[in-house]
A protein has these predicted regions:
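Conserved serine/cysteine hydrolase catalytic core
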Residues: 150-200, 429, 433-488
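Conserved HGGG/HGGXW glycine-rich cap/lid loop of the alpha/beta-hydrolase fold
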Residues: 1-26, 52, 264-312
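Catalytic active-site module of serine/aspartate enzymes centered on a nucleophile-bearing elbow/loop
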Residues: 203-253, 495-519
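Short glycine-enriched nucleophile-adjacent loop
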Residues: 63-74, 80, 350-361, 367
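Conserved loop-alpha-helix segment in the C-terminal half of the alpha/beta-hydrolase fold
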Residues: 6-8, 184-217, 292, 470-505
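Active-site loop/oxyanion-hole signature of alpha/beta-hydrolase fold enzymes
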Residues: 15-61, 302-348, 509-510
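A short loop-to-beta-strand scaffold at the N-terminal edge of the catalytic core in hydrolase folds
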Residues: 256-266
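Flexible "cap/lid" loop of the alpha/beta hydrolase fold
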Residues: 71, 79-113, 358, 366-400
Length: 519
């Protein structure tokens, strides 16, 4: 929706909440919901940000949701535009519910990603995507791989939950909704949009409902804009800060020079804040079990590093280094008002914490490196050359299996490219499909950053920086972690750095770190 918002920004204050279960919004917590349930969530959102009444625009599934909000809560709606509204027959509805929404479950071999790529292609070749007759062929260009990849990433964010809002849209009494509409409404679609076939089925709509087909997608946006501008609108509210949610990590977008950084945090407990830093190709989501383990013990903050997770890449152009990440972390802490903290870094995130301790030693009181990358120069050079090859979207989807096996092999071999007997990780096999799937999504959320971040980590002078660190530092690793041997070697070489073996579950690490952090 960002392109549409930018198109209209000089006319309106545009606010686009992620539908529950999609993007960054929490799901409703049910496997089946009606569109009225989603509409109620929209009203709760309006209440939370202080909007009494608004004009609504929705596209495809959003078109159904916008109409549902107008139908169920007309007192909160000035006017509504539904672009891409579906009015299936009862037979079509039953077929769509049965065929359009297969379960999406990670497979050990990554086959679910190959299926999804084909699914993303088919939905712009046929409608419905599962039908292959000539009559179902769409008169559209096949989007380039980058555009398909963008849609695929949004699908991956929702996961199997993607079916909930789709099903609600298909089962919504859409014709009846238009007949009982009491606010001014426009229902439209371009001729190239497969939903345009439903416009003639909008029989006997309410007097204030306009049904109109347009020649092009751009024409639908111009028509929608004209409709929205005719309506009375309300003053935009002041931005409302995200409110804490007790007992869990809650999200915050932090304004910093160059963009925004996503923060996940919890402030239930008092004391000095613990800052948890993720690895390359990670985010605050990948360290969420570790961060959550501090809830009730300390305030905890986990920040998506620039270019990772949902953070903008705020690093200066060409400056992808551990030092640059440490400076960005310091800027984020300044914006959060955190003057002193303990830092717990997971794998490469520990290097960022270590550099922050050098950059701002008064800021970091205690430092933990979980799985420290204590490599000699020869191994660092080999890792820089071989560990992180860029992965680019491919027309036929081959990049998906490349990403899948890159992540999966990290749980089988060390380094992942040493697929020999010598490289076998013999302590445990970390190849759970759900875990691999989550980490593949992290790659795709950071397409231009993850591999550069790995290379930056492998160029960092970790041995020198550990030898000269002035902050009390703990080295730690679980017995399944290939970094354990490196951590032990570092502790032996640098006796001022104690080592601790960690529980197998990162959700236990917070409790295990507390004696050191509280010392």
């Amino acid at each position: 929706m960002i392109a549409t918002m930018q198109r209209w920004q000089r006319h309106f204050t545009c606010i686009a909440p992620d539908t529950p279960g999609y993007g960054l919004s929490d799901p409703l917590g049910v496997t089946h919901a009606e569109m009225a349930d989603f509409a109620e969530a929209v009203i709760e959102f309006l209440d939370a940000i202080g909007v009494g009444k608004a004009a609504f625009y929705g596209f495809h599934t959003g078109a159904m949701l916008a109409a549902a909000v107008a139908a169920h809560h007309p007192d909160r709606v000035h006017t509504v535009v539904s672009n891409g509204y579906v009015i299936p027959t009862s037979e079509e509805r039953a077929e769509l519910v049965a065929q359009y929404l297969p379960p999406f479950t990670p497979s050990w071999d990554g086959a679910h990603l190959a299926w999804l790529w084909s699914r993303m292609r088919e939905q712009v070749i046929f409608f419905p995507w599962y039908r292959k007759d000539a009559a179902d062929r769409l008169d559209l260009n096949l989007p380039p791989p980058d555009a398909l990849q963008s849609g695929l990433v949004e699908f991956l964010r929702a996961g199997d939950h993607y079916r909930v809002a789709y099903r609600a849209a298909f089962t919504m009494p859409s014709a009846e909704t238009l007949r009982r509409m009491t606010v001014p409404a426009l229902v439209t679609a371009s001729r190239t949009d497969p939903t345009s076939r439903y416009l003639p089925r909008a029989l006997d709509p309410a007097d204030g409902v306009t049904i109109r087909e347009c020649a092009t997608p751009a024409d639908t946006l111009d028509l929608a804009l004209a409709h929205l501008r005719r309506a009375r609108t309300s003053p935009a509210p002041k931005a409302v800060a995200t409110r804490p949610i007790p007992g869990r990590l809650w999200k915050q977008m932090l304004d910093v020079p160059g963009g925004q950084l996503r923060v996940r945090r919890n402030d239930d407990a008092g004391g000095r804040t613990v800052v948890v830093v993720h690895d390359a190709a990670g985010s605050s989501d990948t360290v969420a079990p570790l961060a959550t383990s501090f809830i009730g013990r300390r305030p905890v903050v986990a920040i998506d590093l620039p270019g990772h997770g949902e953070s903008d890449n705020t690093l200066p152009r060409g400056a992808v280094t551990v030092a640059a990440y440490a400076k960005a972390l310091r800027t984020a802490l300044d914006a959060l008002g955190i003057r002193e903290c303990d830092v717990v870094g997971a794998w490469g995130g520990g290097l960022v914490g270590l550099e922050l301790a050098h950059l701002a030693p008064g800021r970091v009181r205690r430092l933990v490196l979980a799985g420290p990358l204590y490599f000699d120069k020869a191994l660092q050079a080999d890792l820089r050359a071989r560990y992180a090859p860029p992965i680019h979207p491919d027309r036929h989807g081959g990049h998906l299996l490349q990403a899948w096996h890159f992540i999966r092999d990290q749980g089988l071999f060390w380094p992942w490219y040493n697929a020999t007997r010598e490289g076998i990780i013999r302590t445990a096999n970390h190849v759970d499909p759900e875990m691999v799937h989550r980490r593949v999504l992290e790659l795709f959320r950071a397409p231009d950053s993850w591999w550069r971040a790995y290379r930056a980590q492998f160029a960092y002078p970790v041995r020198t920086r550990l030898r000269t660190v002035k902050v009390a530092t703990l080295l730690a690793a679980a017995d399944w972690d290939p970094m354990r041997d490196y951590a032990i070697a570092a502790s032996k070489a640098l006796p001022h750095l104690p080592f601790r073996t960690l529980a197998r579950d990162p959700g236990e690490w917070g409790r295990e770190f507390m004696p050191f952090l509280d010392a």
